[in-house]
């Protein structure tokens, strides 16, 4: 009984230490993604909305309907497979009011971009 309680206490303690670390890692991934995405916008939707594309995350940037950006062909495959496909799909079917979230790359995959 005491051994079981000891393991339960250790498990709870490890969870308490792991949760903040995971939250910090998630916030770090999001901030890195947003910074890169704003810098390398990958596509402009048919309604004049620019899209940023970056590893694992996609956000709708500022609506710029007042700029004539609809004619700029920026659908360039600058990211590997899934993110490139999502860039083209989102550029063709924009949904400005939504946040598009995709599975983030691992650190090893990020190095190959």
Curated annotation (Swiss-Prot):
Listed GO CC annotations: extracellular region
2 X 4 AA approximate tandem repeats: annotated span: 46-53
Region (2 X 6 AA repeats): 32-45
Chief location of this protein within or outside the cell: secreted
Keywords, sorted A to Z: Repeat, Secreted, Signal
Region called 2 X 7 AA approximate repeats, residue ranges: 59-75
Residue stretches of each Sequence repeat: 32-37, 40-45, 46-49, 50-53, 59-65, 69-75
Keyword Protein biosynthesis: no
Leader sequence residues: 1-18
Annotated localization: Secreted
Protein name: Protein USP1
Organism of origin: Puccinia graminis
The organism's taxonomic lineage, starting at the top: Eukaryota, Fungi, Dikarya, Basidiomycota, Pucciniomycotina
């Amino acid at each position: 009984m005491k051994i079981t309680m000891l393991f339960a206490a250790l498990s709870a303690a490890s969870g308490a230490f792991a949760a903040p670390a995971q939250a910090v890692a998630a916030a770090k991934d999001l901030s890195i993604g947003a910074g890169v995405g704003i810098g390398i916008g990958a596509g402009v939707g048919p309604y004049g909305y620019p899209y940023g594309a970056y590893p694992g995350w996609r956000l709708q940037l500022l609506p710029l309907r007042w700029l004539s950006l609809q004619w700029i062909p920026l659908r360039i495959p600058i990211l590997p497979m899934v993110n490139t496909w999502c860039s083209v799909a989102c550029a063709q079917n924009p949904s400005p009011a939504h946040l598009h979230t995709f599975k983030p790359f691992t650190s090893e995959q990020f190095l190959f971009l």
